[in-house]
């Protein structure tokens, strides 16, 4: 299907058999939906969105989302099936609420120029995010790139073979619940406003030695930090004035709950928390 022209308030909905592959070619299109996704994939095997050469395409949401048949549609592009973005044109995605692009299966991007502004996640794939190439500028109220599958630890992974990434996020720059593999690419990531917004903390050093000027791991107040040695204070929660615990957003540059493998690329990271973080192993080569 070849799409061009403007739609001021409406959606393109794909609803077909689950064994059917669908291709949309965006040939200079502008679609805004005041209450749903500009493009909504309700049912299909795989959907390919191709950015035609030398075209500028715009997809946006006006700031609200209405639940349709118990489906929580919460992004400017929302797919319940595998979604692939490709082509050499450009795509601007604006989500005043919710996410920029969401796939509830695999999100694959092989090329194109993307400018994404989202109140929540910029790019989100439940089973995986796989990027071969592309030029990405993402501003996100949560994570810029986010892959998470709570049901299957083998999924929720991120694989990036190349591309140029300028990511600014209030949460993590790139986050995965599974493993993460970065083969190449140029990354400029600002997470949580940068290191100047990081919390000052003192860690207990191995052998009981603290930081400079604070023997034995003592805090400037004279108190010892809580928790096990090496554990960062206030990692996951903080206490409000009312005494109730509230979740603290993770503000790491690159974070994975699985293994992190980096074999190439150029990285410039400004993060309020860790630049690189893995809850498993980190392997760097190349």
Predicted regions and their residues:
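A composition-driven surface/loop motif
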Residues: 1-286
């Amino acid at each position: 299907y070849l799409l061009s022209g403007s739609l001021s308030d409406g959606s393109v909905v794909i609803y077909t058999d689950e064994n059917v592959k669908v291709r949309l070619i965006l040939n200079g299109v502008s679609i805004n939906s005041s209450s749903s996704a500009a493009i909504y994939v309700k049912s299909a095997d795989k959907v390919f969105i191709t950015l035609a050469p030398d075209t500028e395409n715009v997809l946006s949401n006006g700031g609200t989302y209405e639940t349709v048949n118990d489906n929580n549609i919460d992004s400017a592009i929302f797919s319940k099936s595998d979604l692939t973005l490709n082509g050499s044109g450009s795509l601007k995605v604006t989500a005043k609420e919710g996410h920029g692009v969401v796939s509830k299966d695999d999100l694959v991007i092989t090329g194109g120029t993307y400018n994404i502004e989202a109140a929540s996640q910029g790019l989100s794939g439940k089973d995986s995010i796989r990027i071969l190439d592309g030029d990405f500028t993402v501003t996100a109220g949560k994570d810029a790139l986010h892959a998470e599958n709570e049901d299957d630890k083998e999924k929720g992974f991120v694989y990036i073979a190349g591309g140029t990434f300028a990511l600014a996020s209030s949460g993590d720059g790139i986050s995965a619940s599974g493993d993460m593999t970065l083969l190449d690419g140029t990354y400029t990531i600002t997470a949580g406003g940068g290191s100047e917004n990081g919390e000052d903390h003192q860690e207990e050093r191995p052998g009981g030695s603290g930081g400079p000027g604070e023997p034995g791991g003592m805090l400037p107040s004279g108190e010892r930090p809580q928790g096990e040695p090496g554990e960062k204070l206030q990692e996951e929660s903080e206490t409000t004035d009312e005494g109730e615990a509230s979740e603290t957003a993770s503000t790491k540059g690159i974070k994975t709950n699985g293994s992190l493998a980096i074999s190439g690329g150029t990285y410039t990271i400004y993060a309020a928390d860790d630049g690189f973080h893995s809850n498993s192993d980190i392997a760097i080569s190349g």
